Each structure stands twice: as C-alpha cells, then as structure tokens.
C-alpha cells in the first residue's frame, strides 16, 4: 500500500515545492528600496488611471415643455461614456407639432483619440511595471550583472515619462471639450425645437465628472512618478558609474602626486 501511494504523494508535493521555491526566491526587501517601491506606486496608479477613465459613464439631459396643451413635458436623458465618441450617441428630440412625435439627434464631437491613448498607456504601464517588479524581486542578480537590463529599463522609463506627460495633457484638454459638448445648455442649443416659440426648454440632468477629473489627476501623478524614477534607474546604469569614475580620477591622481611630494 505504501509503495502505491508514494508516487501520488510526491506528485502532489512537487507543485507546492515549486511554488515555495519561487516565493522563497523573492527578495521582498527590494520593495523598501526606491527602485522597487516606486515601481509598486507606478503599478497601482496605472490601474487607477486607466480604470477611472475607461470605466467612466455619465448622463446629461434637458426638459422640453411644448406650449400646446396636447403635449406634456418631455424629459430627455442622454447616456455617454468611454471612449467618448459622442457623435455616435443618439437621443430623441420631441417635436411640438401635432403630426410628428420626435426626431433622432446625435451629440457632437469625437474625443476618443486622447481617451484611448490615455487608457492604452495605462495598460502598457501596468504590464511593464509588473514585469519589472518580477525582475527586481526574483532576478535582481541578473539585473545588476547584465548591463543591458538597466539601460533598457532607463530608456523605457524615460519614454513612459514623456508619454504620460503627453497623455495627461491631451486627455485633460479632451475632457474639457467633453464637458462643453455634454452640458445641458449645449444639448438645448443643438435642438431646433428650443429655438422657436412653440416650446420652452430648460436644463435637465447635469453630468457628474468627478471620476473623469480623477483620471486626469492620476495621469499627472503617473508622470511625476516616472520622472522621479528616472534618477534611481539611471544610478543602476553603467553611465552613472562612468561619471563617478571620471569625477574621482583627477582627485585620486592629485592625491597620489601630493603623497609623493611629501615623501620627498
């Protein structure tokens, strides 16, 4: 009985042993260093950035009161959200004529380019920082011994810094345009029924932009995190060591000459 059960037990233990070895190989103390700690912040705020922008949805609206008694107050509610292709969002404009009831209208504007670029950059930042954390925690010796890894990490960090600045600024401008296009006043201004004397239009639901405003804030926080991390990544590159060697070279030579003079 013992001989038949031993293979099953060893097969059950082998995956656990592999997981234990993997966890034991992780050097969690690296997270206390700036290089690892900032990567954790970059990973978290990348989630906050693309999550707050990509999950946003809001609504705007207006009220139309026809002067004719045959018509009641019409409430218009328009739902919109990411990726903010507002020209594809439809709503029904009531008509105060006796013959017709409503007319299909569309919001104006397409702000998908800055929004999608912002979300895409956040997703790429999420995956890159997660991969970088694995290298820092599990393969840090390879990272320090191989000079290519710090150089690649530095170049990628500088690139992400630039892209986050562009993405946050572009999405901030795009969000301002989205607010202008989805205001209730913009909705009533686009409806022809509100320009005549046969109806009275007033503002309805006002869109709440709190989550969208946070996404812009998270974008600039990501920029500052990546910009600050450039220095710590640069310190791991051979370029930083060369600069120190060049700075210490003349001082060491002058110290040696001074020692020789004192001996004489």
Swiss-Prot record:
InterPro entries listed in its UniProt record: Marvel, Synaptophysin/porin
Cytoplasmic-side positions: 1-33, 138-150, 235-264
Residues the record marks as carrying a glycan: 213
Record topology, Vesicular segments: 55-116, 172-213
Tissues expressing the protein: Expressed abundantly in skeletal muscle and at lower levels in the kidney.
Biological process according to GO: heart development; intracellular calcium ion homeostasis; T-tubule organization
Region (Disordered): 242-264
PROSITE patterns assigned: MARVEL
Localization, UniProt: Membrane
Keywords, comma-separated and alphabetical: Glycoprotein, Membrane, Transmembrane, Transmembrane helix
Cellular component terms per the entry's GO annotation: membrane; synaptic vesicle
This protein's record includes keyword Nucleotidyltransferase: no
Domain MARVEL: 30-238
Topology versus the membrane: Multi-pass membrane protein
TM segment ranges: 34-54, 117-137, 151-171, 214-234
Cystine crosslinks: none
Cross-referenced Pfam families: MARVEL (PF01284)
Primary localisation category: membrane
Protein function: Involved in communication between the T-tubular and junctional sarcoplasmic reticulum (SR) membranes.
Similarity annotation: Belongs to the synaptophysin/synaptobrevin family.
Official protein name in the record: Synaptophysin-like protein 2
Organism of provenance: Mus musculus (Mouse)
Gene transcribed to yield this protein: Sypl2
């Amino acid at each position: 009985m013992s001989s038949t059960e031993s293979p099953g037990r060893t097969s059950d233990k082998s995956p656990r042993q592999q997981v234990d070895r993997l966890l034991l190989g992780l050097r969690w103390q690296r997270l206390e260093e700036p290089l690892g700690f900032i990567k954790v912040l970059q990973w978290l705020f990348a989630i906050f950035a693309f999550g707050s922008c990509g999950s946003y949805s809001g609504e705007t609206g207006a009220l139309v009161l026809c002067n004719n008694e045959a018509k009641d107050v019409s409430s218009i509610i328009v739902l919109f959200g990411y990726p903010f292709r507002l020209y594809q969002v439809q709503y029904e404009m009531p008509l105060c004529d006796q013959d017709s009831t409503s007319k299909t209208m569309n919001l104006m504007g397409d702000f998908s380019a800055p929004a999608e670029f912002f979300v895409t950059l956040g997703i790429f930042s999420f995956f890159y920082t997660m991969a970088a954390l694995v290298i820092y925690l599990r393969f840090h010796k390879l990272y320090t011994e191989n000079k290519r890894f710090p150089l690649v990490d530095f170049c990628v960090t500088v690139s992400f810094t630039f892209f986050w600045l562009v993405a946050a600024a572009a999405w901030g401008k795009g969000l301002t345009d989205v607010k202008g296009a989805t205001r209730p006043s913009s909705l009533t201004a686009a409806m022809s029924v509100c320009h005549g004397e046969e109806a009275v239009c007033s503002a309805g639901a006002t869109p709440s932009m709190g989550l969208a405003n946070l996404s812009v804030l998270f974008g600039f926080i990501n920029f500052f995190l990546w910009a600050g991390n450039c220095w710590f990544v640069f310190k791991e590159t051979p370029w930083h060591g060369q600069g120190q060697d060049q700075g210490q070279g003349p001082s060491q030579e002058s110290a040696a000459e001074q020692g020789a003079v004192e001996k004489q």
